């Protein structure tokens, strides 16, 4: 999303706890081009792209002691985060279930993690914390409303005459599932459903702030997600007869549609027709070229190499269909899928990252695929 380039071109998987930044200092990001064009830029919430822990780790600390709070100098600058990648301002918690568990503003720690988390008990809605340092007052239920409030404070400071770009990365509905009490029971689909309802409420607060500030008519808002539901979706299927992936097979980490097909909702008054729907296959990597076109930033051929311009799609204008010849999808190392029109080719014996549960297969009328398959080919129109 931030680079216009598929992550598998550089690495597979995710940045783990205590990993360094996935970015090189001269990497292209959309925040950098907004900043160059005079926009104020801010990021709030999750930053699951690594930090420079070496910069704050005390000399001579053994790897097995990385989880200890005393292994770090929390008063030092914490580099490698959003403010090194084009954002003027950042407030967030890094990653909700990865240490350190504390608030970070720009490149400094606001709350100091002093107590250790050795083993976390599962929270009521599901999910745990990885071992590592935690601030004494840390409460996971505060994270979603706090990051939203900080984003609203920043937005309310903006003037209609000063362009701005905000990247608001909610922790919800990622593990741990921590909906606040006022949302309990709202969804009738357990704590996960309630967490989704709370997320919707936070999005609503952002839209209201734009309206009250006189910014809504000239602000492009995009709402999306990074992957499908976690594996607790199987339990919700049994408990509530609710399947988070809709009519699609798969959950997070699967290369089936349910693993990566996500919402993509756009609002831009006067530019995009309200209620319009497109069935064009698009990707979040397309935002880079799209944003560059909107702000008049010329991109070189060596950056945002996987990105396509979505403007004609969003505006309902004529364009050569399809937008792209094919879309490449990837999950674990060596497991890829190629989407072309209604067809999906999975270059693996199964699109699942783990054994699929029997009750799930039976309820959705699916079959498990054996390890001897050389690959799988689906027509999504006939077999979603």
Predicted features and spans:
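Formylglycine-dependent sulfatase
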Residues: 1-376, 380, 384
């Amino acid at each position: 999303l931030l680079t216009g380039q598929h992550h598998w071109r550089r690495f597979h998987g995710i940045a783990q706890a205590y990993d360094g930044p996935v970015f090189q200092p001269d990497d292209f990001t959309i925040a950098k081009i907004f900043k160059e064009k005079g926009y104020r830029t801010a990021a709030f919430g999750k930053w699951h792209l690594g930090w420079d822990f070496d910069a704050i780790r005390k000399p001579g600390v053994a790897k097995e002691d990385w989880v200890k709070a005393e292994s770090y100098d929390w008063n030092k600058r914490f580099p490698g985060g959003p403010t090194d990648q084009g954002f003027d301002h950042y407030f967030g918690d890094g990653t909700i279930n990865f240490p350190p568990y504390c608030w970070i503003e720009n490149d400094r720690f606001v709350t100091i993690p002093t107590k250790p988390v050795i083993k976390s008990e599962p929270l009521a809605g599901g999910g745990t914390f990885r071992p590592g340092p935690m601030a004494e007052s840390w409460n996971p239920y505060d994270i979603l409303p706090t990051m939203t409030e900080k984003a609203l404070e920043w937005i309310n400071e903006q003037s209609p005459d000063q362009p701005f770009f905000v990247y608001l990365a909610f922790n919800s509905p990622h593990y741990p599932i921590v909906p606040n009490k006022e949302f309990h029971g709202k969804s009738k689909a357990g704590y996960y459903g309630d967490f989704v309802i709370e997320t919707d409420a936070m999005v609503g607060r952002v839209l209201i702030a734009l309206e009250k500030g006189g910014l809504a008519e000239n602000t492009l808002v995009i709402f999306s997600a990074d992957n499908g539901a976690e594996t607790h979706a199987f339990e919700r299927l049994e408990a509530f007869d609710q399947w988070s992936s809709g009519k699609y097979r798969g959950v997070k980490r699967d290369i089936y549609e349910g693993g990566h097909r996500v919402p993509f909702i756009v609002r831009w008054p006067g530019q995009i027709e309200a209620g319009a729907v497109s069935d064009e296959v698009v990707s979040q990597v397309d935002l880079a070229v799209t944003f560059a076109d909107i702000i008049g930033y010329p991109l070189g051929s060596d950056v945002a190499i996987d990105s396509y311009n979505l403007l004609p799609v969003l505006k309902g204008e004529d364009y050569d269909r399809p937008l792209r010849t094919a879309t490449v999808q990837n999950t674990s190392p060596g497991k890829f899928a190629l989407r072309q029109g209604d067809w999906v080719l999975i270059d693996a014996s199964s699109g699942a990252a783990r054994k699929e549960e029997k009750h799930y297969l039976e309820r959705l009328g699916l079959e498990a695929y054996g390890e001897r398959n050389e690959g799988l080919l689906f027509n999504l129109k006939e077999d979603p």
